[in-house]
Amino acid sequence: MDELKKETQNADATPRANLSTRALMAILIVVAVGIGFGKIVGVDSVPDRTMQNYKLAQIPKTMEERSKALRDKGVVGERYDAEMQRIYNALLADASKARPTLCANDRSRWATIRALVEKDARVYRFVPDVSSAEINARLKELQEKGIVDDGRITFKYYPEEILVNCAANAPERFEKKNMKAKRYVKKLVPYAIDKAWETPGWDSIDVVKHGLSDEVWRPENPSSGYLYSSKPPLLPTVMAAPYWVLHNVFGLSLVKEPFLTARILLVFYNLIPLAIAFLCLARVVDSLGGSEWTKIFVLASAIFGFFCLSYVATLNNHVPGFAAISIALWAACEILLSGRTSGWYYICAGFFGAFAVACDLPAAAFALFLCVALLAKKPKKTILSAIPAGLVVAAAFLATNYIAHGIWTPAYAHKRDHMDLQRSLAGEKGNDSDSNEVKFSFDPNDWYYYAYYPAGRPREMRYAALSHWANRSGIDKGEPSIARYAFHSTIGLRGVFSLSPIWILSIIGAILWLFERRSVAGESAKEGDDASLTIGNKTRVTKLLAAMTLTLTVIFFWFFMTRDQGDRNYGGVCCSPRWFFPLAPLFALCLTPTLERCAKNRALRWIAYAALAWSVASAFYPTWTPWTSPWLYQIAVDGGLFTPY
């Protein structure tokens, strides 16, 4: 009886599993991959699908009305059949609104991928072939107008001289029909998305506009400049490779077979990287030690307690960034914990640490921590393997950015504080009692503030529009109060810890790791033996992870809290504080010491269960798309407790 009682007490103290830890981890990962695949297969823009179904249902009625009208006019025979077929095709094209792109954010990247792969989506400009005399005359003219580049006078074309191969302004027809005296030279505009933008349903607000170095760029002129994704071009360039294979080898197209093509690509872009990331995290969790219950809980939190699977069905930078950090952590822990000396691990750590920065710029602090830790362990290996691998990514990031924009800095570095600008312009208008005109403030260095021709409209001045970012509305106006933004980003309606309270246990765990004298698992090891050396090494690694997690948390919050008002927008309309995605792998690992203590107390275990359940609910609240407001925010708005943006 005593033995049975003792066994029961032990069962209460530390939950035990019937299966091995690794088998249970494998089951969790397989379930996650299945959920992710299901989300990808079901990807659809529900509002667009609803509109399509409605319009399709109206086609028979419209066709009947058009048929009656034609017969009343005496149209019969082949002419009648041809006209009815034309009407049907037009109605069908107008009704076809369904698409696998879920928001402006992912359409911006999809458009870049299309521009890199599809010949019909590439933007070409046609510039006049000028003589040396014309060049000299233009240089003199530009000098008189004060149009210079870094103090230098260089030849530039005026916007009205340039023809672009857009649907409403085709230079091929221009040349053949009008046969101007000048000869035009065809030149590719790399990464420009003007052509992809014109495809119905492919427009986006996450775009910038600027001219090329040999053009006079006038943002107030809708014919001047070219549209580009506002996202750094490296990630779409990498993603263009699988699409190139699908498009050129198998004949699939994002225009003709959008759902099939997008679903296949999302498996490569998101699902496979996530599966690899989960495997890497499982390996690290297993290496850090702890009870079976703790290990399974940590991995379950990383997979289901955060928003990785929420974003699996949309093209974004956060999932690849999460995967890159997870792989870099695995490689680093293999070096620091398991004593791996192969240069392959250093290359992985350096390459994926840098790639994480390419996906999420604030992850630069993570890459720096990683580099310092590896330098302290093996300086020579780090210098010869890890750092060069990271520099390859850095070089690719800069090169693709320069090819796209003709400058080293990314597009989002070329903008002003638009909300401050709006207030300034509103004040000027208020002081000018004689003016009822809307005031504008165009700046060639602000790529977000421009005039453009909306997709599907004729390229005429009466149809020109001002960019979304120059006339912000809703949540894109940003949060005026930094204190309010800090509150809602942490424990408020859109907070990291209010939506995912499991990460509160992570912060506690990081503090426990940082100040513990020895790993809990090493209490029985004797000084000087192999076990003691292993435990000491593990303690150093856990302290490093703790310091990294706490430092990065502070850096991330400081970085995003100090942005301009327009950037304090909670990541736009989305289900989570997505700016903090890079912290998720670190938060997951730092759960370990907290859960080890929770495992010994039933009440604490139930607190951990409740925190995980709440976090899972937040992550799986968005059914069809992650680009929806968090459930806490929605409940507050529905209950009249909060005014919607």
Residues covered by each model-derived region:
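Membrane-interface transmembrane helices that cradle and orient dolichyl/undecaprenyl
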Residues: 8, 12, 289, 318, ...
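Signature aromatic-anchored transmembrane alpha helix within multi-pass, membrane-resident enzymes
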Residues: 20-29, 348-351, 367-368, 387-395, ...
